[in-house]
């Protein structure tokens, strides 16, 4: 076996939509070689599962492969989903070296599938796609744990045809999102094409192929990134901050470089000044054979990258998920503190003067949320990690723009004392664990609120209208004048002033009748009887005249600045015609 001593295990994250099989896949990988005492057995870490090269080769049934690979195995992050991917960040990008995007072959792409692809593309992370649940294809004959082609060749022609159709629908969806892909065994260049592996996370079919493709990708594209310093100071990323009985606040972290020992001084990233503390205990999970032992962790004196581990230390309150953990010596302490401080500052989001407030559970997910909001041109006034607090509510409440008096929370809760404030202030709070859904919910709400406010404004505003007095349709000359009119633009209502072609206001619309019935409005094309209080036909108004609804100057400004997009083409024509009249003598009228 040609494993290089200074190559660490590549870190793999499994991403995809809810219920598409992320957890089942991790369970299958975990369970595939968890046999007590077996050589090359899978090792359970804190928050991760290590599959050594020997177990992968054995699963593939080809011992000759052992000499072809230099990486020691694969380290799968146990928390599935893009949440884990964004949490596990290293300086300048994602910590995961490789990703597996899982998609249900029978359901195709869903919002989280697309979100996962976007995040991977953003971080330039190599990935494969697994088309899961092939065992659910009608008529499928399962071959437990078999490589995909072995299983595929044992299916009937009809079932193979059904799989091929569904498979190429997945390939088509990848193409629609800008990725060229094909079945993994037909891909020659993984740098430019995505390998798609049909699998069943329940029967284990295709799992050997997946592990082999991941090893190949690691070997091909990552070897230069996997070198680590076996004696150097440990560097890791916090996966989770947890309270453990008897231990207090602990950190679950992935150590991706160097060594971490009990008694080491560490610097931990937080929103304020970095935490400086000493490692009290380094903990690993007990083997499955020791599961009855009351204490589920065992203490070790040191660990070497790449490894998932729990540490206990004083003063860890305030440590950030996704934050950095670095080992420091007396000589390097100041420099390490500065480095960790800079990492957190790198993530401080560029905010706008006015905008919404966003909260997320980790630095990485905050970055992901900010990126998506920026793409949608949604301004952000404040972005922070943590649950929604009383202060967040009060700050959002103080914002004048109702569309910005909003808090968007990704994977967070509202603190108990803040819940009452949400009710009393009316601040709008959106919460979800899918970024797409959060953005859609916010946009839909804005659209709905705009429509409501436009309707309210619109109902109090005099709208543009243009109408002509039809020939031979004078029913009464005055007190009030009653004439037949045709609406040639916009909407005319009762109680609106009437202006002539030179802008003179001559009266007010008292009533409208259509086919003998009283109506309150008349729209373009309608011919109605109109009673106008004020003018006399033959003096101020005449047959054939084109008249306008007289729009007050303040209303014109609202129409032009706030409601312009909601006006129809004929309303715009009527408005332009009215403005031409009013601005003949005063070009700055209503400007």
UniProtKB/Swiss-Prot annotation:
InterPro entries: EFTU-type, P-loop_NTPase, Small_GTP-bd, T_Tr_GTP-bd_dom, TF_aIF-2_arc, TIF_IF2, TIF_IF2_dom3, TIF_IF2_dom3_sf
Segments for region (G3): 78-81
Record-listed GTP binding positions: 16-23, 78-82, 132-135
The keyword GTP-binding is assigned to this record: yes
Protein biosynthesis as UniProt keyword: yes
Domain called tr-type G: residue spans: 7-223
Segments for region (G4): 132-135
One function term, GO molecular function aspect: GTP binding
One cellular component (GO) term of this entry: cytoplasm
Keywords carried by this UniProt record: GTP-binding, Initiation factor, Nucleotide-binding, Protein biosynthesis
Region (G5), start-end ranges: 200-202
Region G1: start-end pairs: 16-23
Annotated family: Belongs to the TRAFAC class translation factor GTPase superfamily. Classic translation factor GTPase family. IF-2 subfamily.
Function (record text): Function in general translation initiation by promoting the binding of the formylmethionine-tRNA to ribosomes. Seems to function along with eIF-2.
NCBIfam families: aIF-2 (TIGR00491), PRK04004.1 (NF003078), PRK14845.1 (NF011418), small_GTP (TIGR00231)
PANTHER family: EUKARYOTIC TRANSLATION INITIATION FACTOR 5B, TRANSLATION INITIATION FACTOR IF-2-RELATED
Protein name according to UniProt: Probable translation initiation factor IF-2
Naturally occurring in which organism (per UniProt): Methanococcoides burtonii (strain DSM 6242 / NBRC 107633 / OCM 468 / ACE-M)
